[in-house]
Regions:
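Cofactor-binding active-site loop characterized by glycine-rich and histidine/acidic residues
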Residues: 129-184
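Short secondary-structure junctions and interdomain/linker hinges
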Residues: 6, 10, 48, 65, ...
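Glycine-rich anion-binding loop/nest that anchors nucleotide
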Residues: 1, 22, 46-48, 179-182
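Short helix-loop-beta junction
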Residues: 2-19, 176-177
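Short helix/loop capping segments that flank catalytic or ligand/cofactor-binding pockets
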Residues: 2-4, 29, 54-56, 167-171
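Terminal amphipathic helices with adjacent charged low-complexity linkers/tails
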Residues: 14, 19-134
Length: 184
């Protein structure tokens, strides 16, 4: 979806050397398929929600490849540039270099922004870069229009009148109560 939102159809992706690999089972990552997919690529952008399960396995699988054939693997963190010692966790504040967030869902717009950023970093023809910029501007305008307004009122939890749980919060004398979830 993110590629289509950026105006990158199958032919354009093929011309740019963009390949997709949808992993069916994330653990363990199938080594032979992974190596076949990675062969000939300069960079791999791993798109996965939450923790870097696939990204770390991919880095480990390709770790011993010669530097001239091993693709740069990115996902949660962006490229730190030449000469940066260590990995992303060697930084004082690794979240300052986030590419795809790990703490929430990844919308097509967020993924599209990451793809566009990486494509522009590795270099694409000027017409495609202009297309990426135009499409991103439209997506950012839509995101701005859909921003959640700041809540001014404080909403306290409560039970609806007539709710059977309302009386269940009162503990009879001599009884003990345990914590539990409620519908409030």
């Amino acid at each position: 979806q993110a590629l289509l939102d950026l105006g990158l159809d199958d032919d354009t992706c093929r011309r740019l050397g963009i390949r997709l690999h949808k992993v069916g089972v994330v653990w363990p990552l199938e080594a032979q398929i992974t190596r076949e997919f990675a062969t000939g690529l300069r960079e791999i952008l791993v798109v996965e929600e939450k923790r870097q399960v696939i990204e770390y396995q991919l880095k480990e699988e390709l770790y011993n490849w010669r530097a001239d054939v091993r693709p740069n693997i990115l996902g949660k963190f962006n490229d730190m540039g030449e000469g940066h010692p260590g990995g992303e966790w060697s930084m004082a504040n690794p979240t300052a270099n986030t590419l795809l967030r790990a703490n929430a869902d990844l919308s097509p717009a967020l993924i599209a922004a990451a793809i566009a950023q990486r494509l522009k970093a590795i270099g694409v023809p000027g017409d495609i870069e202009a297309r990426l910029d135009a499409r991103l501007a439209v997506m950012q305008a839509k995101d701005s229009a859909m921003q959640v307004l700041e809540v001014k009122a404080d909403r306290q939890p409560w039970f609806c009148s007539g709710c059977p749980h309302n009386t269940s919060t009162k503990v009879p004398e001599g009884s003990r109560a345990m914590a539990g979830i409620g519908c409030h």
